[in-house]
Amino acid sequence: VASLPFGGKYRLIDFPLSSLANAGVRSIFGIFQQDNISSVFDHIRSGREWGLSTLLSHYYLGIYNTRVESSTVGKEYYQQLLTYLRRSGSNQTVSINCDVLVNIDLNQVFHLHNTTKGPITVVYKKLPKKDISDVNAILEIDETDHVRSHKLFDNKSTDELFNMSTDIFVVDTPWLIERLEEEAQKEYPEKLRYVLRDLAAKEGAFAYEYTGYLANIHSVQSYYQANIDMLESKKFYSLF
């Protein structure tokens, strides 16, 4: 979905890239299914719009060959990702996706991550049932704002609001490398977002509540509704 048009002149990938750029992130690695990589590259090009075309800032694109809807990946997925992380020299890594549209101040998430001193922090938002799909993770969060467990959304639940993971994570890079090396050794390694969900629950990650506008793009209808939302000035200026 990264290269889908949005709001007239934008693409879905513009929003996570802008959040990263606004937080001062200057090295980005994006990994995409092979059939989609050309349209993503054609849109990003030099990366100049996000400050990614200088001597000290850059981006890389990786590819994988398994189906987009599959939760597992081939060996090449983690070979590329781990190579990038080892060479990045970064103390912290942000993981963010293109199917959840937000305008988030990642500096606030960095600050809380550093304050709590845990290896992983996750961003979530309270949402009603109608805005969530069965591919989204619902977090159980305790009174100290730490994750205790997660599960896929169950449409049969009678709850009014759910703690939906945005699948935005801030993670200590050395710790992440060790965990991903373990994942890469499995016969059927899972995609990064699924690994991070499990790690957040296992490690009792700090849960940062995002309270701004969010569009969860999980179907044609939700994609259409997100575009229609932009006709409302409050939602438009919340995202832009």
Which ranges hold each PLM region?
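Catalytic-core segments of class I nucleotidyltransferases/pyrophosphorylases
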Residues: V94, F110, D142-L239
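Conserved phosphate-coordination/catalytic loops
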Residues: G7, R11, V68-E76, E190
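N-terminal glycine-rich phosphate-binding loop and ensuing alpha1 helix
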Residues: V1-E49, L55
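Residues at the starts of beta-strands that form the adenosine-phosphate
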Residues: R26-I28, Q92, P119, G204
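Short, conserved catalytic or adaptor-binding loops enriched in Gly and charged residues
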Residues: W50-I63, E140-D142, R197-A200
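Alpha-helix N-cap/loop-to-helix initiation residues
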Residues: N36-I37, V102-N103, N216
